[in-house]
Structures are given as structure tokens and as C-alpha cells.
């Protein structure tokens, strides 16, 4: 059974394992029958939080959730939707009028009048921190996405508002600027990256902001030791040492690497929900199955935390990089790669 956790400062608890739905679209090579069967099985297994966005499959992800759950009430299925410009434009037209038009299409596709959570959809430019920062901060301006987000909450189109990004420092900045209820971070918190626990989670804990972890299996690199070795390595310890830690913990616990990855995040009480992205029923059942596994010990979680990179992007951050995102440089962020 999936245990529930409090959704930030709200008086509501949600299952700690949700579903990232992008991988169920044709963009990711999944046919509609498989996608709908996976969504239905997820609901049967106790998953209630479903993450979607207009960008996912050019609106197909929203449509799938509408087909699967449009007949269910707002308390039966918790939709985590995104506020963005037209699909395919990344940081394209995020003006208020544009994102409101796109959100209207989202509601029609979902077959709903409102959603559980609505988040400004941020994208990463991991090799260009100044550009990413400028694009993100433009959304703070009057007449842009964050203004529209808060208006929609006032109108009752969503219960909770938030933001998503691959850069946890920029998410922390948004939490300081706006009365957000939830953030969703990808890339900066999993076994391969330990940036969000340093930059974002202390703030979300302090302010009672729910924290959703996307990409918990590191874009597939944490499925197995084979995929881990094959991926570009950016850890805080030498690769051989990291593999040794993983091999030992897998042997001691009897867990697969993807199970370690999910349980590592669930060990952190500041994490509200993790949203793996399975492509079929078998992968879904494997992901949700970790709910029945014993929790990691503090010592085991600490061993895994040693592996994760402290880098803000795919390079060691420089003084100028950190100055751009408006936070003081910390020595632990300067981990070298091997």
C-alpha cells in the first residue's frame, strides 16, 4: 500500500508515489491502448497524483488523462497540470493571454473544470545558466505566467499553485517571490544529484511547500548498474567508488538499483511525492512495488547521498554562474567530476 504524506502546509495527504505521464505518449513510443491500461492500473494500485503538461505529446498527455479519468471527481484523481505557452515552443509565448488560452485547452482535454495543482512549467538550459535564469525571471513580470497562475487560483481553476524547473536554485527563488503551494524538481534530486537538498528543500520545509520529485530514476540511468555505468558520470566521488557503494547496498538490501533510487528519495520526509515515468503496466507495477519494500536506514541513505553531484549544471559552477542565480557560492557545490 502506498503511504500518504501531507501536501505541504495544506490539510490534505496524497500518496507518496504518483505518476509522471509524459512517457505514456506517442512521442515516447507508447500506443494509446498501453497508455490507458497503464493509467487504469495505476489507479487500481492506489496512485492518485498524475503529472501532465501541454508540452507532453503536444497535448496528448492531457487527452489520455481525460479519457482515463474524466468521469472521476476532483478528490478521486489529483491532476498536476502545467501552465505554459503553446506546445512545442519551450520558453515561447508565456504571456498571460497565451498561457490562459493554453490552459483552457488543457481543461477541455482533461474533461475537468479545475485541477488539483497547476504549476508554471519551466525548462532547463543546463549548459547556459545565465540564459536559463533570464528566461525564468521574465515569467515573474506583470502580464506573464506567474501573474496568470495566481489569478487562476483566485478564480478556483486550481486548488494549489506552484512551479516546475530542472534548476532547484531558480525554484527556490520563485518560492521566495510568490505564495506557492508546491514545487516540482527534476534533475537536481536523485542518486546522481544532491543539489536540491542543499538549495531548495530547506526553504520548502520552512515555508510548508509541497515538494514533488520528477525524474527520480535519473532519466533511466538508475534503472540498473549497466545503465548507470553507460551514462555520463557526474558524481561527487570517483565512479568506481560510486559503483562499489551501489553494489554493496543492492547486495545488502536485495533491491534493484531503481528501487534504491525511489526509496532514497522517499527516505527524505521533506519529499511529498515521487513521480516515476513508466511506459507500461509492468514498469508501473515495479515502481509502485517499492511501497511494500522496507525503508532505507539513515546510514544507507547517507551512503547514497555521498554519490550525488553538487553541481548546479553539467559543469563545475563558477563564481559568475552562482552570482547570476543570486545565491552565495558554497564549497560543497564545487565537486569535481571523474
PLM-predicted stretches and their roles:
Residues 1-78:
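N-terminal binding-site loop/beta-alpha segment at the start of enzyme catalytic domains
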Residues 7, 19, 35, 50, ...:
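Conserved, mostly hydrophobic/aromatic
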Residues 13-17, 46-48, 73-77, 112-116, ...:
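Short, well-ordered coil/turn segments that N-cap beta-strands
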Residues 26-30, 53-62, 86-89, 96, ...:
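Acidic-and-aromatic substrate-binding clefts and catalytic sites of carbohydrate-active enzymes
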Residues 29-42, 94-109, 166-173:
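Short, acidic/polar
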Residues 66-81, 141-151:
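Alpha-helix-loop-beta-strand connector modules within alpha/beta enzyme cores
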Residues 109-131:
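Active-site groove signature of glycoside hydrolases
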Residues 123-315, 321-338:
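Beta/alpha (TIM)-barrel catalytic core signal, keyed to glycine-rich beta->alpha loops juxtaposed to Asp/Glu
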